[in-house]
Amino acid sequence: MKQLIATHDGTFHADDVFGVAVLAAVFPDHEVIRTRDPERLSRADFVVDVGGTWEPAAGRFDHHQRGFTGARTRQDADGQVVRAEVYAAAGLVWAEHGRACVQQLAQSLGHRADDVLAARIAADLDDALVRYIDLIDNGAADVAPGIFGLSSQLALLNTGWLEERQLDAQALAALQLERFHEAMAVVHRALQRFVLRAIGQAVAAGDVRGAERVAQGRVLLLREGGMPWTRVVVEEMPEVMLVVFPESSRAQYQLRTVPAALGSFASRMDLPAAWAGLRDAQLAQVSGVPDAVFCHKNLFIAGARSLEGALRMAALALAR
């Protein structure tokens, strides 16, 4: 049965776009309306970011009403449960339907996410994206610099004065609904990519754990390029300093330092400072590895044309 999803009209923000996009993914047979008319809202199956009610079981997801107390909870350093980021519409919808959204998107991409995996992906996505949408909407954080944050990107799709001044009310409402659907498509695509990457990490995890280790266990050797390894190595392999793997085109083998923590730009170790920014013949001369290709100036990745060359570079880096 077609689900009627309602949100407010006028200017949209990331939280209402995101919430509606999530529901649209969970319920592919749907219609979206934008209104503040209480009578029309009352007929909707879901009402997002308008209506003055937070009642998930009834499909109501507003956060503007007086007395609203919805917030995430986290454990502090002492193990006590404390209030964290306050919900906006995006977080309210995600808390209720995030896992189902992940499973629906995974299925649409030809994969399966069981309840455990889907719950983990949903939690990761809330931590990486949804809570920031909520923070911005609630005025608790600034948008990303420039126009690169998702909230700013979606805001750019709103109609502007030059367009609005030429349209009557009916034409303007139609254009705003069209732009809202454009914004929903951006969110849907972003969710798809996040879910696909997360499933890839889950599928690859077993291969990463079983991969060969050399140099007394300090170098992990992956036989397939492009495999997501960072989370498993950072969280489960404290002794691994470097990861060696073929470039996706197999034109070279690369060695990469392991981040000190997930999301960190600091590494457990750096490559030799003398290699920084060198390429080809210069790097070969300085390193003593004939087929050395490059070393990034920030000393976190380097490469050679052969596996033997990359492993030799890894051994030299560890021997410093």
Label each PLM-derived region with a short phrase.
Residues I136-Q254, V258:
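Glycine-rich, Lys/Arg-enriched anion-binding loops that position phosphate/diphosphate groups
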Residues A202-R320:
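Gly/His-enriched, cation/cofactor- and phosphate-binding structural elements
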